[in-house]
Swiss-Prot record:
Gene Ontology MF terms: 4 iron, 4 sulfur cluster binding; metal ion binding; molybdopterin cofactor binding; oxidoreductase activity
Cross-referenced SMART domains: Molybdop_Fe4S4
UniProt-listed Pfam families: Molybdop_Fe4S4, Molybdopterin, Molydop_binding, TAT_signal
Family annotation (InterPro entries): Asp_de-COase-like_dom_sf, MoPterin_dinucl-bd_dom, Mopterin_OxRdtase, Mopterin_OxRdtase_4Fe-4S_dom, Mopterin_OxRdtase_prok_CS, MopterinOxRdtase_cofactor_BS, Prok_Mopterin_Oxidored, TAT_signal
Requisite cofactors: [4Fe-4S] cluster; Mo-bis(molybdopterin guanine dinucleotide)
UniProt keyword terms in alphabetical order: 4Fe-4S, Iron, Iron-sulfur, Metal-binding, Molybdenum, Oxidoreductase, Signal
Subunit structure, as described in the record: Functional polysulfide reductase is made up of three different (A, B, and C) subunits.
Record has Iron as a keyword: yes
Post-translational modification remark: Predicted to be exported by the Tat system. The position of the signal peptide cleavage has been experimentally proven.
Lineage of origin: Bacteria, Pseudomonadati, Campylobacterota, Epsilonproteobacteria, Campylobacterales
Domain 4Fe-4S Mo/W bis-MGD-type: 44-100
Organism superkingdom: Bacteria
Stated name of the protein: Polysulfide reductase chain A
Job of this protein: Component of the phosphorylative electron transport system with polysulfide as the terminal acceptor.
Length: 763
């Protein structure tokens, strides 16, 4: 059943949001507000899909409800999220119908960053882009164009287009957020790890604020653990919501997480609190690890992290006593120290030392089809993976990536080629990268906003202004699109179908991706279609042989119509039964389901790991001399500066949702947290206009005086201070903290650094 909603109906339904700034604007070419008439057509039945208001990708259902707009709720079939959505997820309808969203292609007619645009047809936009890409290819080589896409399904299409074009320089957003913990997982465990928070009895949390960053499944698990009596200890410089929920909050010195973890680990090892049997059977490199951290006593590390040695030792002893139902949470955004790879490896090693791997209330391997199948007998049915549709081989590229990922002895050998070290793109453009294989002449950016998400925004803007071509695919004129030559209008997540995905928690599963709830508004197109049509204009159509997204999906499931129908109806499908390799009851249930797996069970009724856990990295030792662990002091700020740290708010998603009317109305700017003693010394009172400044930039905001932050530290929420004047609600409000950050790339991990120094004064 289809429901049609006219522009008059829409304006009527939007009236309730008038106070939130939902004004029908005629000032921005190519926007929904510039259309004279628009019918909104969609399903009156609930359609299972995936939210895209942040990168957590929660499962949802949505439908059109007459003249009331689109109703969004959590998918009730998803037990991990309990059928819930957060404030951001609930505002998806508001983003869909935002008059300031882009629904037609636009091209720059003034200087970059001047904000002068004209509407163009898709054919005109494609022709311009294809011609410019060919010119760069002929003059400088295809490898001099970088392609960046935010993590998600759009990345599939545009990274494929990039490699068909001949560029190896494809990037995601990970080096500005979670890359180091993914690298650490590959180094220590050989792959990704999941956390069973709900069954844990003791959790150490170092700034992984799931209550404000909001991952609904994690929120529910943490709350279940707390309600069941688990002890949660939080270490971070400010009193976050996570810290408020915790049993203990310790205000650790910014950027000094690693000394705490090393002192904690030192206690486990040198007081013989670790699980000797587990380490001996399943781990390698223990003696090398022990030797590397011997100097890192709790007493020495306490002087660095500002947590007393007695506290470090007490927490380690309590943690070991609670194991294996104890988790040292390795976090998500990992941009706090130049030694991020060492820090995240250390956190993961702590879990291995207490033997919590593949245990209830501990950590476990993500079990996709290939991982799961290795424990099945020959006669047992196997979990299916998704097939990748066949395409021609990519052209051979002779020039290495600018980050040299893929080279045998490259510094960032643990990084994924599909993510890369994106912060190197501006440096390679401006010739600020010693030994770079090439200069970047063009940047194709898909639903990513480096002006707001990369450090030292002025450098990013300078790089954008110097390029031969900048193309953005987005739903709005973002801060980066503000400096583009062409902006192509992507659909919102409620207007498109996407590819299927395969993954696994405790057993393999498939996901629907996203399903279209309403027809695209204006002339917006989904990413798969933009990439396919542009490839045809570029003479690369053979690389996109599928007719449409439905054809692509059918090839993914190898023509399995039953699986196709189930995924479209339910939104997900799983295989087998949950498996925890070191839990006898789970292994017994697994063997009951798959009798052939009995041959994999050891004398203890458990299943051994497929490979050893690595507590010392021979490859890292070879490349950087850092196979073990150790602490290297770093100067984050000058003596007369304060530390600045940032975090997420539950009503903003990085730089993505600042202009969404409802969310902007909930939080227009980010007041900066200042300790009362610090504010008193500076003559600053609550609510005063203030200026933050250092040698890189200056930003203005308001003061929030609170004891919930260290005296030597300022705190602000991320996602404010937008520079695009076409984001009319969000422009110029609050602090873009990235503008104040130095351009620093952490060794071995390639992470940006989000802890830095600033001065503050009354504005």
């Amino acid at each position: 059943m289809e429901t049609t909603m006219t522009r008059r109906d829409f304006l009527k339904s939007a009236g309730a949001a008038g106070a939130a700034g939902l004004v029908w604007s005629q000032t921005i070419p190519g926007t929904l507000g510039a259309l004279e008439k628009q019918e909104i057509k969609g399903s009156a039945k609930f359609v299972p899909s995936i939210c895209e208001m942040c990168t957590s990708s929660c499962t949802i259902e949505a439908r059109v409800e007459g003249d009331k707009g689109v109703f969004i709720r959590g998918n009730p079939k998803d037990k991990s999220r309990g059928g819930k959505v957060c404030a951001r997820g609930g505002s998806g309808f508001n983003q869909l119908y935002d008059p300031q969203r882009l629904v037609k292609p636009i091209m720059r007619v003034g200087e970059r960053g001047e904000g002068k645009w004209k509407e163009v047809s898709w054919d005109e936009a494609y022709t311009f882009i294809a011609k410019k890409l060919d010119e760069i290819k002929q003059k400088h080589g295809a490898h001099t164009v970088a392609f960046t896409a935010r993590s998600g399904w759009n990345k599939t299409w545009f990274h494929h287009l990039a490699q068909a074009y001949g560029s190896p320089n494809i990037f995601g957003h990970e080096s500005t957020c979670p890359l180091a913990y993914n690298m650490a997982g590959r180094d220590v465990f050989g792959g990704s790890m999941n956390r069973d928070f709900a069954k844990a009895k003791y959790i150490i949390n170092m700034g992984h604020n799931v209550f404000e960053g909001i991952v609904i499944s994690y929120v529910r698990q943490y709350m279940e653990a707390i309600e069941n009596g688990a002890k949660v200890v939080t270490l971070e410089p400010r009193l976050s919501v996570m810290a408020q929920k915790a049993s203990e909050w310790h205000a650790i010195k910014p950027g000094h997480d690693l000394p705490f973890v090393l002192g904690f680990m030192h206690t486990l090892i040198f007081e013989n609190l670790y699980d000797k049997k587990f380490v001996q059977k399943y781990c390698t490199g223990f003696e090398e690890l022990k030797a590397s951290i011997e100097p890192c006593t709790p007493e020495k590390m306490a002087l660095e992290c500002d947590i007393p040695a007695d506290t470090i030792k007490r927490l380690a002893r309590e943690f070991a006593k609670a194991a294996p139902k104890a988790i040292f949470d390795f976090g998500h955004r990992v941009t706090f120290t130049p030694q991020e790879l060492e820090l995240r490896r250390a956190m993961m090693m702590v879990n291995a030392l207490v033997g919590n791997i593949e245990r209830d209330g501990g950590m476990y391997f993500g079990k996709n089809a290939s991982f799961y199948n290795q424990f099945l007998g020959e006669e047992d049915p196997k979990a299916k993976g998704l097939k990748k549709p066949k395409t021609p081989a990519y052209p051979k590229v002779e020039v290495p990536r600018i980050d040299r990922i893929g080279e045998k002895d490259g510094e960032f050998f643990l990084a994924n080629k599909g993510e890369g070290i994106v912060s190197l793109v501006p440096k390679a453009t401006l010739n600020e990268l010693p030994g770079v294989p090439c200069k970047i002449h063009g940047w194709f950016i898909v639903r990513n906003n480096p002006v707001m998400t990369q450090t030292n925004a002025d450098t990013v803007i300078k790089a954008l202004k110097s390029m031969d071509l900048v193309v953005c695919v987005d739903i709005q004129v973002s801060d980066t699109a503000w400096f583009a030559d062409v902006v192509l209008p992507d659909t919102t997540y409620l207007e498109r179908d996407e590819e299927f995905t395969a993954g696994g928690g405790k057993n393999p599963s498939f996901g629907i991706g996203r399903q279209k709830v309403v027809e695209p508004l204006g002339d917006a197109k989904p990413g798969w279609k933009i990439a396919k049509e542009l490839s045809e204009k570029m003479g690369l159509g053979e690389y996109f042989p599928w007719k449409d997204i439905e054809d692509y999906r059918l090839q993914q499931v190898d023509g399995d119509l039953d699986l196709l129908a189930k995924l479209k109806k339910d939104g997900s499908a799983s295989f087998g039964v949950p498996l925890m390799l070191q839990e006898k009851k789970s292994v017994a249930e697994f063997v009951k389901k798959f009798p052939g797996a009995a041959s994999k069970v050891n004398e203890e009724g458990l299943i051994d790991f497929p490979k050893k856990i690595q507590l010392f990295s021979p490859k890292l030792e070879e490349v950087s001399g850092k196979g073990g662990l150790g602490y290297e002091p770093f100067k984050y700020k000058e003596e007369d500066e304060l530390y600045f740290v940032q975090g997420k708010t539950p009503v903003r998603s990085n730089s993505h949702t600042g202009n969404v009317p409802w969310l902007n109305n909930l939080m227009e700017y980010d007041a900066i947290w200042i300790h009362p003693k610090t504010a008193s010394k500076l003559g600053i009172k609550n609510g005063d206009a203030i200026e933050l400044y250092n040698k890189f930039s200056s930003q203005k905001s308001k003061a929030l005086i609170t004891e919930g932050v260290r005296e030597d530290t300022l705190f602000g929420y991320f996602g404010f201070g937008h520079v695009s004047k076409d984001l009319k609600r969000a422009y110029g409000k609050g602090v873009n903290s990235n503008a104040l950050m130095p351009s620093f790339t952490s060794p071995n991990s390639g992470m940006d650094l989000h802890v830095f120094g600033v001065k503050v004064k009354k504005a």
